[in-house]
């Protein structure tokens, strides 16, 4: 299955449950029949016991790792007991394939999982999606960093946060998705125990950093809206927020250095983690969900609630006012009571969109994993397909952020449009852009023409008024507005 997941507890949780129930399984089903083929390869069936060679072949067939994230493990795995009969208990690492609640027993029906195919989206589709994600994440975030480097003279706190978030997302693509692709090709872990700990630590750290840099960005937007005139220590505070985000990410990643180690799993060396019991996995996943999603989401929600309240309390950013001498048509000007620049509001909208995408991408994954470790996900082929889709949403967050930058930042779009392949794409949209520009110019020109006509009428009226004041007993009417008539008496000679 495609599960680009950071904290995949399903395999380890399933193996722990299977090890506890292996004694019961060996006493009740010493020989299992397999009809046809299962998953990606066939398993010899009938009443025959499996030889070590057959077991190795089965393990190689079912051991398709999905390792792009922190708790990464084989998608489907066939575990064997140490008994002489080589009883095979097939377990699945997908969230949709949990054992019974509590994890202390397998299904009473030995053929329940025979028709379930954990390779719902098989290797070709998985590799295709992985390569697409990797390409979009790396190219998109590299393009954003390139734009920030080209326009480094235009410094702003928002650009600083965007650069840090793009750097974290780029690391997600290079360390998580690329590692997943490589491990799917090699099957076994071949880098050693030290590299196992270092790479796992790096994967967790960049995942946390992508989240907590977003939290820091939200806090900065909160400060920019609630204290719009506070410029004295804004840059220093922004740097402290980013440094704190990376420091918190590193601290939350430290347990990985202890939990992960290189182990021999089914005859293949793997970078592995074992917690021992389903309860331990429930506690672990609860902590991960809180630190990776729940706490950041609460902080971000609180910041934006205060931002919305502040903007609402200060009134509209642009208030309507009547144009002097041109009827009641509303004009827009900055409010003198609460000055919040238009650019600052635009950055708030962009950050809010990034936060919304973050919640959309992560909440299904977190909820699904929690339901899995607590035994609330039933076994079915449909759930495998659902899990495959949900698990692909996490890295989509890193792929979507660059698109949001281009959508909200004209600077990013203009800079990228000067370089291929973005230049080729903008050329395709040239005709549409020209038509839109002509329509805008026509509208603006018509408004300017009407405005000039009105000014010309007022100037003519004032000229007539000034000339008429030299005549005795003359009365001049200035037609400034059709609804109002102003009468000016002529100056009389002194007697």
Swiss-Prot record:
The chain crosses the membrane at residues 55-75, 130-150, 165-185, 240-260, 288-308, 354-374, 384-404. Residues 24-45 are annotated as: Disordered. Coiled coil: none annotated. It holds the Pfam family 7tm_1. It is found in: Cell membrane. It is a multi-pass membrane protein. One of its GO terms (cellular component) is membrane. Gene3D superfamilies: Rhodopsin 7-helix transmembrane proteins (1.20.1070.10). It comes from the Eukaryota. In adults, expressed abundantly in the head and very weakly in the body. GO terms for biological process: ecdysis, chitin-based cuticle; G protein-coupled receptor signaling pathway; neuropeptide signaling pathway. PANTHER family: CARDIOACCELERATORY PEPTIDE RECEPTOR-RELATED. Belongs to the G-protein coupled receptor 1 family. Vasopressin/oxytocin receptor subfamily. This is Cardioacceleratory peptide receptor. The lineage of its organism: Eukaryota, Metazoa, Ecdysozoa, Arthropoda, Hexapoda.
